[in-house]
C-alpha cells in the first residue's frame, strides 16, 4: 500500500482524542488530526517522531493527518487505523493471504448479524462457503509480541459474538489482525487490557472461527516511509 507524501515532526502532545500538537524542524507548532481513537499505547509518546500527510480538502478544519510514528527504538507504526482495511484489501486482491486466496469476490462493509454490524469484508467464491472477515489493527507491541487490543473494546467484543453466530450458521468466519507495526514476530491477545475480549476469542476459536495475524513491513525512499505491506503470517501464541 502506497502511503501519501509524508513530512516529519516531533510530537508534543495528543489531546481530545482526535488532535495532536507537533513541532516542525523550524520550531513552528502545528495542530494535526489523529484518526486513531484508541489508547495508542506505546506509539504516541512526547518526543516521538511523527510522520503526517496533507489534504487539500477545503472542508477540513485540520488539513494535516498523523499517519505514522517513528519509535525511539527505530521501529515504525502506522497509527492511522483507517489504513488497516486498505492494507488488508490489497493483500486479499493480491492473493497474499493464503488461507483466503481461493475467494474471487471481495465485498467491503456489508451489513450483517443481529447486533447491527458491518463486516469489513465478505468473501464469496463458487462452491465455497461465504467468508466473513473482521480486520483489527495491531499497533501495540511488547518484546516483539504484537497484541490487540490496546484498550477495552466493547465493539471488538460485539464483532466476535457476530462471527461466532456466522460460524454456527455454516459460514467461514475470520478475525484478521493486520500488522501496522514492523516490530513483532508473533501475536497474542492483550488479556491484561481486555480479559473479556480474550475470553470471547477463545470461545470463537472453539467454535471454529479462524485467527490470522500478519506482520507489517515499511518501505523507504530517501529515508522517508513510502509504503506499508503485509508480508507473512506470524504465530498466534494465545490459548487454543
Curated annotation (Swiss-Prot):
Disulfide links within the chain: none
InterPro entries the record matches: Ig-like_dom (IPR007110), SfsA (IPR005224), SfsA_C (IPR040452), SfsA_N (IPR041465)
MF annotations from Gene Ontology: DNA binding
Pfam families found in the cross-reference section: SfsA (PF03749), SfsA_N (PF17746)
Family: Belongs to the SfsA family.
Name of the protein described by the UniProt record: Sugar fermentation stimulation protein homolog
Organism of derivation: Pasteurella multocida (strain Pm70)
Amino acid at each position: 500500500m502506497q502511503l501519501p507524501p509524508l513530512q516529519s515532526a516531533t510530537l508534543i502532545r495528543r489531546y481530545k482524542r482526535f488532535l495532536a500538537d507537533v513541532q516542525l524542524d523550524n520550531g513552528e507548532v502545528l495542530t494535526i488530526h489523529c484518526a486513531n481513537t484508541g489508547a495508542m499505547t506505546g506509539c504516541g509518546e512526547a518526543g516521538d517522531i511523527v510522520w503526517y500527510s496533507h489534504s487539500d480538502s477545503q472542508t477540513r478544519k485540520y488539513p494535516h493527518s498523523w499517519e505514522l510514528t517513528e519509535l525511539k527504538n527505530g521501529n515504525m507504526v502506522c497509527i492511522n487505523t483507517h489504513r488497516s482495511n486498505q492494507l488488508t484489501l490489497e493483500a486479499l486482491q493480491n492473493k497474499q493471504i493464503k488461507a483466503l486466496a481461493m475467494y474471487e469476490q471481495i465485498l467491503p462493509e456489508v451489513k450483517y448479524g443481529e447486533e447491527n454490524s458491518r463486516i469489513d469484508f465478505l468473501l464469496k467464491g463458487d462452491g465455497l462457503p461465504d467468508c466473513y472477515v473482521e480486520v483489527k489493527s495491531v499497533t501495540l507491541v511488547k518484546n516483539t509480541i504484537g497484541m490487540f487490543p490496546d484498550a477495552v473494546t466493547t465493539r471488538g467484543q460485539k464483532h466476535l459474538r457476530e462471527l461466532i453466530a456466522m460460524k454456527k450458521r455454516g459460514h467461514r468466519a475470520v478475525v484478521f489482525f493486520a500488522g501496522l507495526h514492523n516490530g513483532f514476530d508473533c501475536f497474542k491477545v492483550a488479556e491484561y487490557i481486555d480479559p473479556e475480549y480474550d475470553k470471547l476469542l477463545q470461545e470463537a476459536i472453539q467454535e471454529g472461527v479462524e485467527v490470522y495475524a500478519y506482520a507489517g513491513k515499511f518501505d523507504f525512499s530517501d529515508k522517508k516511509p513510502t509504503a506499508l505491506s503485509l508480508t507473512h503470517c506470524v504465530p498466534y501464541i494465545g490459548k487454543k
